[in-house]
């Protein structure tokens, strides 16, 4: 198989055709024109339907330069913590791990898990504990972060966190139904993340 690869590669590079990527738009709609001609031969009195390629729009041009700042909107169900704030970087606790977002980041949707979100602006770092939510990172250097609950890290009482962790651990150990176990597990997960945020 490998001994033929150089010959196949040479043949592929010298041929005049190019296989487009799945996201590329076709240079010409040859398949559409063939379809329209066949349609008009069979049913000349009815306009041909539009094919999927008729609805495709060209991709917007990629900006030539990356903005120097990331614009962040950080929203809770009951308030807006940050609205149009220009920052250098945001680190979010995604379910896939800690995710740093800089200006020019690729468009992404990330689910948030309980953890610390840090907002970096120059030498200042603001830290929030988020219980969960979603982050929508747009290609134009905007980030919309929606959290179920968020508290500035400096407003969290470490003693209450320890007390809550012990309480939910006890509930988890004594839970008898699946619902009780699930509720206790959520409490343990959130308080463990709070404890880790305060101690580390």
Swiss-Prot record:
Q: Where in the cell is it found?
A: Mitochondrion; Mitochondrion inner membrane
Instruction: Give the domain of life.
Output: Eukaryota
Q: How does the record describe its quaternary structure? A: F-type ATPases have 2 components, CF(1) - the catalytic core - and CF(0) - the membrane proton channel. CF(1) has five subunits: alpha(3), beta(3), gamma(1), delta(1), epsilon(1). CF(0) has three main subunits: a, b and c.
Entries under SUPFAM superfamilies matching the protein: Epsilon subunit of F1F0-ATP synthase N-terminal domain (SSF51344)
Tell me one GO molecular function of this protein. proton-transporting ATP synthase activity, rotational mechanism
Q: Which GO terms describe its cellular component?
A: mitochondrial inner membrane; proton-transporting ATP synthase complex
Designated name of the protein: ATP synthase subunit delta', mitochondrial
The family line of this record is: Belongs to the ATPase epsilon chain family.
From which residue to which does the transit peptide run?
1-21
Q: Which InterPro entries match?
A: ATP_synth_F1_dsu/esu, ATP_synth_F1_dsu/esu_N, ATPsynth_dsu/esu_N
Q: Which CDD domains match?
A: F1-ATPase_delta
UniProt entry keywords in alphabetical sequence: ATP synthesis, CF(1), Hydrogen ion transport, Ion transport, Membrane, Mitochondrion, Mitochondrion inner membrane, Transit peptide, Transport
Main role?
Answer: Mitochondrial membrane ATP synthase (F(1)F(0) ATP synthase or Complex V) produces ATP from ADP in the presence of a proton gradient across the membrane which is generated by electron transport complexes of the respiratory chain. F-type ATPases consist of two structural domains, F(1) - containing the extramembraneous catalytic core, and F(0) - containing the membrane proton channel, linked together by a central stalk and a peripheral stalk. During catalysis, ATP turnover in the catalytic domain of F(1) is coupled via a rotary mechanism of the central stalk subunits to proton translocation.
């Amino acid at each position: 198989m490998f001994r033929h690869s150089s010959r196949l590669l040479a043949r592929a590079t010298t041929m005049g055709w190019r296989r487009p990527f799945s996201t590329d738009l076709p240079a010409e709609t040859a398949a559409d024109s063939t379809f329209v001609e066949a349609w008009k031969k069979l049913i000349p009195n009815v306009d041909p339907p539009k094919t999927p390629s008729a609805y495709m729009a060209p991709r917007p041009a990629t900006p030539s330069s990356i903005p120097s700042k990331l614009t962040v909107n950080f929203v809770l169900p009951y308030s807006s913590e940050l609205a149009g704030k220009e920052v250098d970087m945001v680190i979010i606790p995604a379910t896939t791990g800690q995710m740093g977002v800089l200006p020019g980041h690729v468009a992404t949707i990330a689910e948030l898990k309980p953890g610390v979100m840090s907002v970096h602006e120059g030498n200042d770092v603001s830290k929030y504990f988020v219980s969960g939510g979603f982050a929508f990172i747009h290609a134009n250097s905007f980030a919309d972060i929606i959290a179920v609950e968020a508290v500035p890290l400096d407003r969290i009482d470490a003693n209450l966190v320890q007390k809550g962790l012990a309480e939910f651990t006890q509930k988890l150990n004594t839970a008898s139904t699946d619902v009780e176990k699930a509720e206790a597990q959520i409490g343990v997960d959130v308080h463990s993340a709070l404890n880790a945020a305060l101690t580390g």
